Amino acid sequence: MQVQDLEKIFQDKIDQEIKIEPKDWMPDAYRKTNVRQISQHAHSEVVGMLPEGNWISRAPSLKRKAILIAKVQDEGGHGLYLYSAAETLGTSREQMIDDLLSGKAKYSSIFNYPTLTWADMGAVG
């Protein structure tokens, strides 16, 4: 089958709102965009753990510490699920992490702001 035929079938599925599965044929640019968006979301979940985790020992009460620990664990879980989703599209977790560490991949910039007070942490998280 020619690429033009595959693109037409793909676009027909999109137009009919048929779900595209990871193993389905899709244009390379579409696949790359999905991997970029999913990995950026995964990176944001994992990096988002950092300002929250920094406050676990300084939370104002035991109840808030427990809530914050659960939230940090939840963010980590979200990141792992998203990395797994991106892996189904044909990229490796190692490559996504390498791209993050090299600056090629991004994450939400809100996590670059300092969380100097408990209120700051709540606003960022």
Can you annotate each of these PLM segments?
Residues 1-125:
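Non-heme di-metal
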